[in-house]
Amino acid sequence: MISEERLLKVILAPHISEKSTVCAENNNTVVFRVAIDATKAEVKAAVAKLFEVEVDSVRTLVNKGKTKRHGARTGRRSDWKKAYVTLAAGADIDFVGAE
């Protein structure tokens, strides 16, 4: 069993983009930024508990941080993980919270 404290640290934020909006409309899929060390099972449990929805599947990927220049110096942005969470038919997550 995964601790409740860990579940709260797994999901960092919803990832809003043109592609994620199309996925949400057509495939009932929501996209989240998650902790880099989070597993699919942890993501599934966290979404189910926090948003009280049934999760069908979870797909994850790691985006590698880009190398950026600041004048003569080079730096690197952090790697981050993204999770595509497919919800069960009829389930919905409302991020705006409008009533």
Swiss-Prot record:
GO MF annotation list: rRNA binding; structural constituent of ribosome
PANTHER family registered for this protein in UniProt: 60S RIBOSOMAL PROTEIN L23A
Subunit structure: Part of the 50S ribosomal subunit. Contacts protein L29, and trigger factor when it is bound to the ribosome.
Protein name according to UniProt: Large ribosomal subunit protein uL23
Taxonomic path: Bacteria, Pseudomonadati, Pseudomonadota, Gammaproteobacteria, Alteromonadales
GO BP of this protein: translation
SUPFAM superfamilies: Ribosomal proteins S24e, L23 and L15e
Family: Belongs to the universal ribosomal protein uL23 family.
Record-linked Pfam families: Ribosomal_L23
Gene3D superfamilies assigned to the protein according to its UniProt record, in alphabetical order: 3.30.70.330
Function: One of the early assembly proteins it binds 23S rRNA. One of the proteins that surrounds the polypeptide exit tunnel on the outside of the ribosome. Forms the main docking site for trigger factor binding to the ribosome.
UniProt entry keywords in alphabetical sequence: Ribonucleoprotein, Ribosomal protein, RNA-binding, rRNA-binding
A single GO cellular-component term on record: ribosome
